[in-house]
Regions:
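Generic alpha-helix initiation/capping and coil-helix boundary signal
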Residues: 11, 26-30, 58
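Bacterial N-terminal signal peptides
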Residues: 18-27
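N-terminal secretory signal peptides that target proteins for export/translocation
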Residues: 1-12
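Residue-level micro-sites within transmembrane alpha helices that shape
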Residues: 12-13, 326
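Sec-dependent signal peptide cleavage junction
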Residues: 29-40
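Glycan-processing catalytic domains of CAZymes
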Residues: 39-357
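Hydrophobic alpha-helical segments, especially transmembrane helices
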Residues: 14-15, 62
Length: 357
């Protein structure tokens, strides 16, 4: 995850992007599809939003996309991103959030995992707006869109046991009872990034949980591949979506391997730990300023994403997570882009329908 840097966020204005922007807006408002030529020569189709009936969504098979509410209109720059959105937006605008929720719902996504950097941060304020827009969507269409937060453990405000306890208490008291906060079997769900990074230990997290959630009234999903996390957390997820399996051509084996490890843990400990299989459209963080160890997972015009989805579903997951809806700095977004239009939302819709049954 790469949060925007402070600065002017300079970007080159391109005429073709302006034309695409107008076409997208017309497509959303008008009754027919609008066609435009993509920057890389692809033929892009932008269709009106159509929310599927609630009866078509299986609440026992959630699809949750990692989501970033930190952009301003000055953020967008081809110098720091491998692609650009069809609409350069401000994450704080209600119209932006409403549009993103509609796009996601149309694709069969059931909620966002909102990157969260602490009480009072814009990601906190915008999460409240996300819940409000989700309520508005359900009132208008009957579609239940329920989101949660991604506890960014490396964020300055979230470092150290005392800060973690304080912030989690705020989260649970402020949001957990909202009807559009993601619940699983009646319990609020939280996702945690990199729980064992920066000298954090399982013992520390166990102490945190005793203070914040002594009765295990919530569900905690940890990012990571180490099943020892399950001694404190209720499940694991892979923000990376197991990209090494994509590059190695054995993605299905990777996902099934994690399913088998969790099943073995559950059998040995008489638990019901959760496997959240991740899917990835591609990845490219080579333009992130100052980042070392960058890499690329090629998109292959949607083939990578389809392979990732097929592998995830073959592992009989409890949940499916998408990396990501809109992490533009790392090039892992499915949100409509200049290069691909709404290709990745369309692919999401196809596989989400299969998953929902």
């Amino acid at each position: 995850m790469q949060r925007p840097l402070n600065g002017d966020g300079r970007f080159v204005q391109r005429l073709v992007v302006a034309v695409l922007l107008v076409m997208v807006m017309v497509g959303l408002i008008g009754g027919g599809a609008v066609q435009a030529s993509g920057v890389r020569g692809r033929h892009v189709v932008f269709s009106p939003i159509h929310i599927p009936p609630a009866s078509k969504i299986n609440p026992n098979r959630p699809v949750l996309a990692f989501y970033y509410a930190w952009y301003s209109t000055s953020t967008w720059c081809a110098c720091t991103m491998s692609d650009l959105p069809t609409i350069r937006y401000n994450s704080s605008y209600n119209a932006t959030i409403a549009r993103q929720v509609q796009w996601a719902a149309n694709a069969g996504i059931t909620g966002f995992i909102n990157s969260w950097w602490g009480q009072g941060d814009p990601t906190d304020t915008n999460f409240g707006k996300l819940l409000a827009q989700s309520a508005a969507l359900e009132q208008q269409t009957g579609y239940h869109f329920a989101s949660t937060i991604y506890f960014e453990s490396d964020a300055p405000a979230l470092r150290g046991e005392s800060n973690i306890v304080k912030q989690l208490r705020y989260l649970l008291s402020h949001y957990a009872n909202d009807p559009h906060f993601f619940h699983w079997h009646g319990k609020p769900v939280l996702f945690f990034w990199n729980p064992l990074g920066n000298a954090r230990t399982l013992a520390m997290w166990a102490a945190v949980r005793r203070q914040v959630d002594p009765n295990n009234a919530t569900i905690w999903s940890a990012e990571g591949v180490d099943t020892s996390l399950l001694s404190v957390f209720d499940g694991i997820h892979l923000f990376s979506a197991g990209y090494w399996g994509i590059l190695g051509g054995n993605m299905s084996a990777v996902d099934k391997g994690f399913r088998a490890k969790i099943d073995a843990y559950n059998k040995a400990h008489h638990t019901s730990k959760i496997w959240a299989a991740g899917v990835l459209p591609g990845y490219n963080d080579t333009k992130v300023p100052g980042r070392k160890g960058t890499y690329i997972v090629p998109r292959n015009n949607g083939a990578t994403y389809r392979t990732s989805w097929s592998a995830a579903l073959s592992s009989a997951p409890d949940w499916v997570t998408i990396t990501t809806f809109n992490e533009w700095f790392e090039g892992a977004m499915i949100e409509p882009s200049v290069s691909y239009g709404n290709l990745y939302l369309n692919i999401t819709q196809q596989f989400a329908r299969q998953w929902h049954g």
